[in-house]
From Swiss-Prot:
The gene is glyA. The record marks H227 as: Plays an important role in substrate specificity. It is found in: Cytoplasm. This is Serine hydroxymethyltransferase. Pathway: One-carbon metabolism; tetrahydrofolate interconversion; Amino-acid biosynthesis; glycine biosynthesis; glycine from L-serine: step 1/1. It comes from Actinobacillus succinogenes (strain ATCC 55618 / DSM 22257 / CCUG 43843 / 130Z). The lineage of its organism: Bacteria, Pseudomonadati, Pseudomonadota, Gammaproteobacteria, Pasteurellales. Pfam families: SHMT (PF00464).
């Protein structure tokens, strides 16, 4: 018999944890750059009966019967993704960004091939060749970084490309606040006859809104997550406009059957919702405010004497270095967390601390903007953060945290996420 109890009735312990998370999201300010708040429509799709359906294969070419309606769902997601980013090809099945990246490598590389990617310590991602990742174990990874000014060292990229002759150059980041010159990266890739693969996960929403350069005209393949600035469900997406049907076929085969089995149709439906939302004019307004809020926060940190890596931001995130202050990212993370402000500790260039400690934090504006924060609100918040950070190690530290927490709760009440659970 089909059990029809609610979670609260069936599993009170789990329900209590879920409700506490709802309250945490309502009563804490979220500044983790890779997080965002999805709409009720996205959640409705993810909680639908589509979760019941197995659909190995692709629309019109399934290994299971009864897929006539999920075919419509997936094709909607594919078509909307193409329209949103100007792509010729889209695969909406990857379960995550890392899975999407693994599929790209599997499609175009062989084990032992050389890839040239951005150093994790300089703002890259684990899957761009870090030695602790599959990308640095299966493939021979060479890493490039940023200059003392905090911008990508294209001369270094070119030199290392000429020396290592990679089969693929990986562009993209998890903690880089400036604009990447996609055309320059393609020029370097062409010089060594390499594929250019772009991971635009962090800036996909800005790109969709036309506020950050689109890599599709330059890259052979592009991947992204569907959350972060895109504000959709957790998942991955592969795109291309290279015009090479052979590459498209290899990418499809690398996702299924090589890396994954059945797609998550409820998540694909949520992706379709997310892409439709991103095609609305209001999405561009939102993304423009994301940029304004990030820049407003940067100015406050600089005015208060903190070092901002790259001296600013041209997207939704920025890094604050505490090397000068002698603080660690772990200390800052904990202190801000006690005041209901959630950030993540992050390594910064020339960081003397270990990765689990770090000397900096990463700050992102997508979630606060989703709540309705203006530039004034964002600047005020940055000031509160500076108050907390400056009080670390001082006698008034606990008092500052308590006062800041009260202010945070007040603004969260004024600008709720969903307005439930408090």
């Amino acid at each position: 018999m089909l059990e029809k109890k609610t979670i609260a009735e069936l599993d009170p312990v789990l329900w209590d944890a879920m409700q506490n998370e709802v309250r945490r999201q309502e009563e804490h300010i979220e500044l983790i750059a890779s997080e965002n708040y999805v709409t009720p429509a996205v959640m409705q799709a993810q909680g639908s009966q589509l979760t019941n359906k197995y659909a190995e294969g692709y629309p019109g070419k399934r290994y299971y019967g009864g897929c006539e309606y999920v075919d419509i769902v997936e094709q909607l997601a594919i078509d909307r993704a193409k329209e949103l980013f100007g792509a010729e090809y889209a695969n909406v099945q990857p379960h995550s960004g890392s899975q999407a990246n693994a599929a790209v490598y599997g499609a175009l590389l062989s084990a032992g091939d050389t890839i040239l990617g951005m150093d994790l310590a300089h703002g890259g991602h684990l899957t761009h060749g870090a030695k602790v990742s599959f990308s640095g174990k299966i493939y021979n990874s060479v890493l490039y970084g940023i200059t003392a000014d905090g911008v990508i060292d294209y001369a270094d990229v070119r030199t290392k490309a000429l020396e290592s002759k990679p089969k693929m150059i990986v562009a993209g980041f998890s903690a880089y606040s400036q604009v990447i010159d996609w055309a320059k990266m393609r020029e370097i890739a062409d010089e060594v006859d390499a594929y250019l693969f772009v991971d635009m996960a962090h800036v996909a929403g800005l790109i969709a809104a036309g506020l950050y350069p689109n890599p599709l005209p330059h890259a052979h393949v592009v991947t992204t997550t569907t959350h972060k600035t895109l504000a959709g469900p957790r998942g991955g997406l592969i795109l291309s406009a290279c015009g090479d049907e052979d590459i498209y076929k290899k990418l499809n085969s690398s996702v299924f059957p090589a890396n994954q089995g059945g797609p998550l149709m409820h998540v694909i439906a949520a992706k379709a919702v997310c892409f439709k939302e991103a095609l609305e004019p209001s999405f561009k307004v939102y993304q423009a405010q994301v940029l304004k809020n990030a820049k407003a926060m940067v100015e406050v940190f600089k005015q208060r004497g903190f070092d901002v890596v790259s001296n600013g931001t041209e997207n939704h995130l920025f890094l604050v270095s505490f090397i000068k202050q002698g603080l660690t990212g772990k200390q800052a993370d904990a202190a801000l967390g006690a005041a209901n402000i959630t950030v993540n500790k992050n390594s910064v260039p020339n960081d003397p601390q270990k990765p689990f400690v770090t000397s900096g934090i990463r700050v992102g504006s997508p979630s606060i903007t989703r709540r309705g924060f203006s530039e004034t609100d964002a600047a005020t918040l940055a000031g509160w953060m500076c108050d907390v950070l400056e009080s670390i190690g001082k006698d008034n530290h606990e008092q500052v945290i308590a006062e800041t927490k009260t202010k945070v709760l007040d603004i969260c009440k004024r600008l709720p996420v969903y307005g439930i659970g408090r």
